[in-house]
């Protein structure tokens, strides 16, 4: 345990140095919140006395963007009920970072640079801060981009844009798309989701340019390393009315599933009109440590004492 925790501490220091050197400001927001974002199948643990433990600091960090901050990051605990396994833990550590005036392509570049800085590639340092703390060293990593529409056409045999089916989309993601991503190996960005799977992401407009998509898609990507999902990124939706509609639709879906009915965070919704353009990402620290230390179980990279 001592060896892994020392490596983890060095990795987290490396993450902080990367963002500090880029001019980001580290922030802290509340772990207990009153109004989680309503998302299907993501349940926040309730707190005695009221409120919930956060599944993500996303809404609170976007409020900071609306208050005038430009580049921010946060490392801290997050919680999800009912998630436990070799890659899941009810409590986990996340880093989220956000940029005003950016898109998901800017965050994509951030992530590539961060992974190289931390050691996934020939530029890796096999000692960190003078300590003998080896991390995984591989040849220069290959990063691939796979678009969701192409992935479903090629590996699932149907087009979610022409025949949307939420259950089928989720099932095929787990049984066909993610295994295909694992077979590619290395880093894979799964990009450009159907509008129905936009979550809190901005929708693109269909283009008439011959080299650009002629259909609308959510400016969203998820990143996998050797098949392990590591990060989820959006060009942020900054349209107040559209976000309210999506939240209300998600609340209705949660009611049908008999899941907790979270109150809406109107302070967040109203703040969107003061952001205009932004992008951000959530990345699992525990899973990143698993990758860099070649560890198979998430429980082995956390201090369970």
Regions found by a protein language model. Give the residues of each.
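Short, conserved secondary-structure transition motifs
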Residues: 130, 139-158, 276
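Catalytic palm subdomain of template-directed nucleic-acid polymerases
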Residues: 100-107
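A translation/RNA-centric and nucleic-acid-associated enzymatic feature enriched
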Residues: 14, 24, 30-64, 71-100, ...
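Short amphipathic C-terminal alpha-helix that caps PH/PH-like domains
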Residues: 108-118
């Amino acid at each position: 345990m001592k060896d892994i925790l020392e490596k983890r501490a060095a990795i987290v220091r490396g993450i902080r140095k990367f963002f500090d050197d880029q001019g980001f400001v580290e922030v802290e927001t509340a772990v207990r919140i009153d109004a989680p974002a309503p998302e299907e199948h993501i349940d926040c643990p309730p707190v005695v006395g009221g409120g919930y433990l956060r599944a993500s600091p996303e809404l609170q960090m976007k409020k900071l963007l609306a208050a005038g901050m430009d580049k921010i990051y946060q490392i801290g605990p997050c919680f999800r009920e009912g998630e436990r396994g070799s890659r899941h833990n009810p409590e986990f550590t996340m880093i989220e970072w956000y940029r005003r005036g950016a898109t998901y392509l800017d965050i994509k570049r951030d992530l590539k640079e961060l992974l190289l800085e931390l050691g996934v590639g020939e530029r890796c340092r096999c000692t960190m801060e003078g300590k003998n703390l080896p991390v995984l060293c591989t040849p220069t990593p290959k990063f691939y981009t796979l678009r969701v529409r192409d992935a479903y056409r090629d590996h699932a045999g149907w087009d979610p844009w022409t025949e949307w089916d939420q259950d089928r989309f989720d099932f095929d993601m787990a049984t066909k798309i993610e295994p295909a991503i694992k077979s590619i190996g290395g880093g894979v960005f799964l990009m450009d989701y159907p509008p129905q799977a936009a979550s809190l992401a901005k929708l693109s407009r269909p283009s008439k340019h011959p080299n650009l998509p002629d259909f609308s898609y959510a400016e969203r990507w998820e990143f996998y390393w050797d098949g392990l999902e590591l990060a989820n990124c959006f060009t942020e939706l900054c349209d107040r009315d559209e976000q309210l509609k999506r939240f209300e639709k998600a609340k209705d879906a949660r009611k049908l599933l008999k899941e907790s009915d979270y109150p809406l965070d109107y302070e967040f919704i109203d703040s969107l009109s003061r952001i205009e353009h932004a992008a951000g990402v959530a990345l699992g620290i525990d899973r990143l440590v698993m990758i860099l230390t070649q560890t198979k179980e998430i429980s082995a990279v956390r201090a369970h004492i």
